[in-house]
From Swiss-Prot:
Enzyme class, first EC level, given as a word: transferase
Gene (name only): lpxD
EC number of the protein: 2.3.1.191
Protein name: UDP-3-O-acylglucosamine N-acyltransferase
Active site: H234
Amino acid sequence: MKVSDIAGALGLKLKGPDREISGVNTLEAAGPEEISFLANPKYIPMLAGTRAAAVIVSEEYAGQVETALISANPYFDFGRTLHLFARPQGSFSGISDMAYIHPEAEIGGGCTIYPHVYIGARARIGEGTTLFPGCYVGEDCAVGENCLLYPNVTLMAATTVGDDCVLHSGVVLGADGFGFARTEYGIQKIPQIGRVHVGNDVEIGANTAIDRAVLGVTTIGDGTKMDNLVQVGHNVTIGNDCLIVAQVGISGSTHVGDRVTMAGQVGVAGHLTIGDDVTVGPKSGIARSIEPGKTMGGQPAVERDVYMRTLTVMPKLPDMYKRLRKLEKELEALKGESGRDS
């Protein structure tokens, strides 16, 4: 593949001589037949020393390399380039005789079903979808077209997944929500009889669990991307194009709007509303609803400017405490002297 081929595939302008490209790498590690990219200005000094055959850059830096692909969004276009070089997922094709497919299940054309997959009654698998070994698709489930379910993904009964979704290993959709009642007879389970729906173009990271609703539907909106080890409680609604980073926990019946970003280890209490375009910093604890467009951080979470001022003050607290104690003692001494004088 030549640089001109990549430029044509991505619709980018080529500056400089055309070259052969055999792979993709970082600026530092790239060899003379690899393409790289510059998205972060702090790596500009690496342009002078890179051995890369070509670099995807914004127009302002194109003059610093011999061969450049000029991009308005170098990181995004680098991702598109990776698709051109990505290795095929597995060598198997077709439907394995060692998969169990219920007679009432429907399998679309061009699907790949690996050995040891289970597909239950009335389940539907859309065209071009791949299920790797160990996947479980329960009865009445529906998986859309061109989806990729990595090994050991579990879809419990009546779960629905849209088109172009990627579910990484260990994902569980539709397990019972954490519903229990304390009674005089002990802790009693509340049956969870709802389901989970995942929209189109959703990616869910390894070992993430999204619980079925008590009644109704737990919903993940179109275009949302979730990292590994995320927990979504029953009856949660997550909007479109959200980014949910690792170890986030969202408690039951909370509504998350569109384009929300939650950094790692955010905890969200139940029955809240998180507005559109909210950003929440890492390790934050959300205990109340948040208006659209806010940036929050801390435990409990407050608006970013308040949180940053708090972080600035916290290292000074031990010294401030010592000074306060000293002032208190001096004040007590002055009171004592004043009492003796009277």
